Amino acid sequence: MNRLTKKLKELKAENKKALVAYLVAGDPDIESTLSLMKLFIESGVDIIEIGVPFTDPIAEGPIIQKAHDRALQKNVSLSLIFNMIKDFRIEDNETPIVLMGYLNTFISHKDLIKNNEENSIDSILVVDIPGEVNLADYGLESSNVNTISLISPTTKENRIKSIAQNSSGFVYYVTLRGVTGSSNLNIDEISKNIEKIKKYASVPTLAGFGIKSPEDAKLLAKCSDGVIIGSSIVKMIEESSDSREFDRIGQYITEIKQAISWID
């Protein structure tokens, strides 16, 4: 069974919420990314989401855009990312890994996705195509890689149905109107929209974008199957890029994990 599917089933059976942590591969360098992935697991992360650097990351806010720029300056490619993941798999063959990126990158390296040597990755999220589009149409299908689609607060119900049914990993509900890293969570709207998604989805619905504090995470975990933390982690990585001291990130993740583990 695909690692992501297995992990989400286990969490559901244990009545637990999933914690997904995001970082951009190669920011500040590929060695630090590998170290951070290990730190994520030690701090309680269930699933790792790796951003694939791209020249025009239109779905991202300024914090993550800058991380893409820094990684590109280090010539980080999808091939290099796969090699890094293979190194990670030497020590950890259990943690699900999701690649989040843009269509042109994945098409340019479609053999990496299709072959997925040693089952390195578990899912891909292509952010710049409609969620109801089948990745097989782009030659990106793989028997052991499932797909994740985005649904936003402005997505109409007829599209919610088709997008939810097209997702084989989980549905990624974007909690905010705009790009990643925005603020001000409308919990009532989020709760209603996730309820709507769950009518159609056979896979879990996780919430992301705009989660800054353990309190934010706890609120979202009450109405979703898990939370995705991105911009706040990427910001801390940037602030620690000179020293390469990432302990503060581990502490932050631990606090998020504790918050979503105690849902009233």
Predicted regions and their residues:
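Hydrophobic faces of well-ordered beta-strands that scaffold small-molecule active sites
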Residues: 19-23, 48-50, 97-101, 124-126, ...
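Catalytic cores of alpha/beta
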Residues: 30-41, 155-166, 207, 211-227
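Short, well-ordered coil/turn segments that N-cap beta-strands
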Residues: 14-19, 44-46, 92-97, 120-122, ...
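Conserved N-terminal beta1-alpha1 strand-loop-helix module at the mouth
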Residues: 1-94, 165, 247-254
